[in-house]
Design a protein with these regions (language model features):
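Short, acidic/polar
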Residues: 2-13, 69-76, 154-165, 246-256
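Flexible, glycine-rich active-site loops centered on histidine and acidic residues
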Residues: 69-115
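Active-site pocket-lining/capping segments in soluble small-molecule metabolic enzymes
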Residues: 104-152, 159, 190, 194-247, ...
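Catalytic cores of alpha/beta
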Residues: 67-80, 158-162, 187-190, 210-216, ...
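Acidic (Asp/Glu)-rich catalytic clusters
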Residues: 10-17, 45-55, 76-84, 130-136, ...
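Conserved, mostly hydrophobic/aromatic
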Residues: 21, 79, 166, 170, ...
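Active-site beta-loop-alpha junctions enriched in small/polar residues
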Residues: 1, 24-28, 63-65, 92-94, ...
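Glycine-rich, proline-tolerant flexible connector loops at the mouths of alpha/beta enzymes
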Residues: 12-44, 94-105, 171-187, 270-272
C-alpha cells in the first residue's frame, strides 16, 4: 500500500480529533541462513510522514530488543532532527520472541533505554564524557504497563515494581496493554498509586474483530477474557458476528472508563480503522 495506505487508515479517524498516533517498531528479522528478511519501511520515515501531513503528535516505539545502543542513538538523533519528541519506550521481544535475549551492545531493560534517552536530554551522548546543553534533546517518554502483568514477571506486584523503576528512570506516562475487564485496569491503577506511581495511566483498548481472537489474544498477550465475552464469542458462527460482539464490548469498556475520568483512551487499530470508527461514533 505504501504511504497512501497509511493515510487511508488515518483519514477516516480525523473527525474524532486524535491527540496522538502511536507507531510500532520491529527489529530486523533473519531467516535460518542469517539473511535479513525485514521488508518494511522504517519507523522514522513513517512517523515523519504522518506528522508533517497531519500535524498530529506521533509517538514512535523505541525498543531495546534487536538494537544496539549506538543504533538507538542514531534513531533518536534522526527523530530529534525531525522535531519528533514523543516516544514510547519498550523492552520489546528481541529476535527470538520465545526467549528474550538483549542485543549485544544494546540496552537490557526499558529502564536502561530510558536512562539513555535522559542522558541525551541532558546533552550527553554515548561517546561524551560531559554534558553539552547546546545539543540536548527534548524527548517525552511513555512506557508500557500490564494490568494482567507482563508474561515474564512472577507476579503483578513484581511487575509494578519494574514499572516503578521505569518511571523513576524517566517515564512520564503509562500506556497499558490491552485488557477486556475494566476492573483489572482499576485494580492495576490502585496498585500503581500505592506503589508511588503518580503519572497518568492511559488504558489500551483492542476491539475484537475475528472469531480466532478468542484463543489467539489470551495466548499471545497473556491475558484473560471475561467469561461473558468468551461465551458470546464462542457462539459466533462468522467473523462478522464476532466483530459485532467485539464492537459492543469495546463501547461498553470505553464508556465505563471515560465515566471514571481516565486521562485518555488508546485504541489498538492495527491499520484497520473501520471498527474503531464505528465504536468512536458511539463513544465520543
Amino acid at each position: 500500500k505504501g504511504i497512501e495506505g497509511i493515510y487511508n487508515t488515518i483519514d477516516p479517524l480525523l473527525e474524532f480529533n486524535p491527540q496522538f498516533i502511536n507507531i510500532t517498531t520491529h527489529c530486523e528479522q533473519y531467516d535460518a541462513s542469517g539473511k535479513r528478511t525485514r521488508k518494511r519501511p522504517g519507523t522514522v520515515a513513517v512517523a515523519a510522514a504522518i506528522m508533517h501531513k497531519y500535524n498530529i503528535p506521533v509517538v514512535p516505539h523505541i525498543l531495546c530488543g534487536g538494537f544496539t545502543r549506538e543504533e538507538t542513538e542514531y534513531v533518536l538523533m534522526d527523530l530529534n532532527f525531525l522535531g519528533i519528541d514523543n516516544l514510547l519506550v519498550l523492552r520489546g521481544d528481541g529476535r527470538n520472541k520465545d526467549i528474550y535475549q538483549p542485543e549485544v551492545g544494546g540496552n537490557r531493560h526499558a529502564a536502561d533505554l530510558l536512562r539513555q534517552v535522559q542522558d541525551m536530554n541532558r546533552g550527553k551522548y554515548l561517546d561524551d564524557e560531559t554534558e553539552n546543553s547546546s545539543v540536548a534533546t527534548n524527548f517525552n517518554c511513555g512506557v508500557a504497563g500490564y494490568p494482567e502483568k507482563h508474561y515474564s514477571a512472577a507476579s503483578l506486584d513484581e511487575d509494578i515494581q519494574h514499572l516503578k523503576e521505569k518511571i523513576d528512570a524517566g517515564g512520564q506516562y503509562i500506556v497499558t496493554q490491552m485488557f477486556f475487564d475494566n476492573q483489572k485496569y482499576f485494580e492495576f491503577v490502585d496498585k500503581c498509586r500505592k506503589a508511588g506511581i503518580t503519572v497518568p495511566i492511559v488504558p489500551g483498548i483492542k476491539p475484537i474483530g475475528f472469531m480466532s481472537q478468542v484463543d489467539v489474544l489470551p495466548k499471545i498477550f497473556s491475558l484473560q477474557l471475561p467469561q461473558a465475552l468468551e461465551q458470546a464469542l464462542r457462539k459466533c458462527k462468522t467473523n462478522e458476528e464476532a466483530a459485532a460482539v467485539g464492537t459492543e464490548w469495546a463501547i461498553m469498556q470505553a464508556k465505563e472508563l471515560m465515566a471514571h475520568n481516565v486521562p485518555s483512551l488508546h485504541w489498538f487499530t492495527y491499520s484497520d480503522p473501520a471498527q474503531v470508527i464505528q465504536i468512536a461514533k458511539s463513544v465520543y
